[in-house]
Amino acid sequence: MLSIIQRVNCANVVVDGQKVADINKGILALVCVEKEDTHQNFEKMTDKIIKYRIFEDEAGKMNLSLADINGEIILVPQFTLAADTKKGNRPSFSSGCPPEIAKEKFKKFVDIFKNKYDKVQTGIFGADMKVSLTNDGPVTFTFKV
């Protein structure tokens, strides 16, 4: 399981001209489920994102988590994170999870996340999404669990 998280002042996702997710201060997370991912991976990634201290405290130190600031999050499915880019000039997705399986795994991940944190919105799996954000910092991290 892969994720890129970005600290944002605001972010939104639009599909077919309709805003499907819209947050203020929090995290925009691009999330990729892989073939071998299990419930344990989903739990670990959820805990990592919720507890990772990327927000500044009163001293200006990155010492507060999403939960600490009561921030919002958008989970955006992003299968291209699993691309093999080592050879040539075109990404390979041969090791990726088939779409129907990936969609179900992403749903399970979102369900786990929503059970642990209540300010969760999502993009739409398989949709052509327009993602907008105001990055704060920028502060961006990559996770693999």
Swiss-Prot record:
According to the UniProt entry, what is the EC number of this protein? 3.1.1.96
Record's subcellular location: Cytoplasm
Motif mapping: Gly-cisPro motif, important for rejection of L-amino acids: 137-138
* A GO BP annotation: D-amino acid catabolic process
Q: Name one Pfam family in it.
A: Tyr_Deacylase
| Main location per the UniProt record | cytoplasm
**Enzyme class per UniProt:** hydrolase
Domain remarks = A Gly-cisPro motif from one monomer fits into the active site of the other monomer to allow specific chiral rejection of L-amino acids.
Q: Write down the HAMAP family for this protein, in alphabetical order.
A: Deacylase_Dtd
The entry's protein name is D-aminoacyl-tRNA deacylase
Origin organism is Francisella philomiragia subsp. philomiragia (strain ATCC 25017 / CCUG 19701 / FSC 153 / O#319-036)
